[in-house]
Amino acid sequence: MIEARACFDAKLYTAAAVMVRRTLEGICIEQGTKKRALFQALQELRDDGKIEGRLFDWAQALRVLGNQGAHFSEESVDREDAADALSLAEALLNYIYVFTVKYEEFQNRRQSQGKTAG
């Protein structure tokens, strides 16, 4: 995400979208997906319960935007789309690496105290 943010700050919006896509690929690899294609790897994250429906939809939208930036066409990524891509990618990172861990810690603490979480 550091490179994506740097590209955005330099007004290189297409490059920022490509870096966001690269971040998605990194998340999938780090989460242990077996599928090589990003579309299928994101589906695997969803099917394994690591992301939910709306986050999956967001991730797919980011993948498409990243593809738009990565493949030559007359269509470039504008500032608003790049800003949205950064925001959505940060939300996805927070969900997987922050909120999920906090929820699991909460559940474990409650369980060790003999309480139910829900």
Regions found by a protein language model. Give the residues of each.
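Charged alpha-helical initiation segments
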Residues: M1-Y13, A117-G118
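Charged, alpha-helical scaffolding/interaction elements associated with membrane systems
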Residues: D9-A10, D48, F72
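Alpha-helix boundary/capping and short turn/kink residues
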Residues: A10-Y13, G32-T33, E75
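Residue-level detector of well-ordered alpha-helical segments, enriched
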Residues: L12-V20, R54, W58-A61
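Hydrophobic alpha-helical packing segments in soluble, helical-rich domains
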Residues: A16-T33
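Short, charged amphipathic alpha-helical segments flanked by flexible coils
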Residues: I29-L65
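Charge-enriched, short contiguous segments at helix-coil
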Residues: D57-V64, Q68-G118
